[in-house]
Design a protein with these regions (language model features):
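Catalytic glycan-binding domains that act on GlcNAc-containing polysaccharides
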Residues: 61-236
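N-terminal secretory targeting signals
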Residues: 1-89, 220-236
């Protein structure tokens, strides 16, 4: 079974979020995800596949995708390159059960894949049962969701990669809408909106942002090398 097939099965079986409110959450029915999905699909550009004189497949416009601001997301949306993008992030996280929900919700919410995965690296190093105890609350799971902010989630919810990824990426979407750029959005994710907009961002948060952005830069470079090895623009 391919990763893409498992992704479809995973999504079909997701009836999870908001468990404590009574009704099951079905992601396909979420109006926010539906609107986002309609918006981003209209922007898709096709990867061009050609055959050279020796019968080798080449991808002459693959570098156009890699030069874009969110190359991994753009290539995830292309049928030709999608499976290889999935393979890359499954290898990165070490688990389909971790990578596939992040890919799914980042796509639906139009969030950069490299930003999303870098955030999870910074928060939990891709450990779905990671726990951090604060003085008055607990952070849990992949996106380290806070027990005070997400009071409606059960302990099982926090440690469920699908549930955690949805809530973490929805909160990141909010942070991106409030911040001036991705760096400020990460600061809001870590320290909260009030402290950041008041100019009271803690030094620890600034280090946190630098660490995640540094990891992301390395991730982008590695991803680009991987894609070029899988989809050569020309045959050397």
């Amino acid at each position: 079974m391919t990763p893409t097939t498992k992704l479809l099965l995973l999504i079909a079986g997701v009836v999870l979020l908001g468990c404590s409110t009574g009704d099951p959450y079905v992601p396909e029915a979420d109006p926010v995800l539906i609107r986002a999905n309609r918006r981003v699909r209209a922007e898709s550009e096709l990867v061009v596949v050609e055959t050279d004189d020796e019968g080798q497949r080449v991808f002459p416009n693959i570098e156009n995708f890699l030069e874009g601001p969110r190359s991994a997301l753009a290539l995830y949306r292309e049928e030709v390159t999608r499976d290889r993008v999935v393979d890359y992030f499954v290898e990165l996280t070490g688990s389909e059960s971790i990578a596939l929900p992040i890919l799914y919700y980042a796509d639906r919410l139009d969030i950069s894949l490299t930003l999303a995965f870098s955030l999870v690296w910074g928060e939990s190093r891709f450990h779905p049962v990671a726990v951090n105890y604060n003085s008055r609350s607990i952070d849990r799971g992949l996106f380290q969701l806070n027990s005070l902010t997400f009071r409606h989630l059960t302990e099982d919810d926090f440690f469920n990669p699908e549930v955690n990824a949805f809530h973490g990426l929805k909160y990141l979407e909010f942070c991106l809408s409030q911040g001036e750029d991705e760096a400020q959005a990460l600061a809001i994710y870590n320290a909260g909106l009030t402290r950041v907009v008041r100019g009271q961002t803690p030094t620890s948060t600034l280090r946190y942002v630098d660490q995640i952005l540094g990891y992301r830069a390395r991730l982008v470079a590695d991803f680009e090398s991987y894609i070029l090895s899988q989809f050569p623009p020309t045959i050397a």
